[in-house]
Amino acid sequence: MKSWFRTEDGWAVWLGLILVLLALPSAFGVDLLGWAAKPEVWTSPGQSIAPLSKAYAGYGRAVHVLATTGFVLALVGLGAAWMRFDLVEFMPRFAALFVISCVCYTLGHNAYIAATPDKRAGLGLDWSLGLTGE
C-alpha cells in the first residue's frame, strides 16, 4: 500500500483535512480563517473581494489576497516539499496557476454573470445570466 504522504492524492486529502480542522472552530465562535479572501458578486472591481469574516473588514483587500495566496502556497509547498518536488520549479508555476484561477473565479462573480433574479434589484441590474459565482 502506498503511503498517503507520497502521492498527490494523499496530500490532497491531508491538506483538505487541515483546512476542515482550521474551519471547524468557527462553529464554536473561534474564527481562524476569517482573514481569507473570498470573491463577492460585484458591479465594480473594488467590490469584488472581501474577507470571509466581517471582523477582518478593516484590512485592505490586498492584505486578504496576499495572505490567502501565501497561506495556500505554504500548504501546497509543504506537500510538494514532502514529496520531494523541485520547489524552485514547482512554486512559481503553482503560484501562476493559482492566481489565474482566482482571477477567473472572481470574474465569474461579476453581477451580470452571477447575480440571481432575487439579487438583481439590490445591485441595480435589469438583467443578469443568473449563473451564480460557483
Name the predicted role of every residue range.
Residues 2-134:
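Helical membrane-embedded segments and adjacent short helical loop/helix-boundary regions
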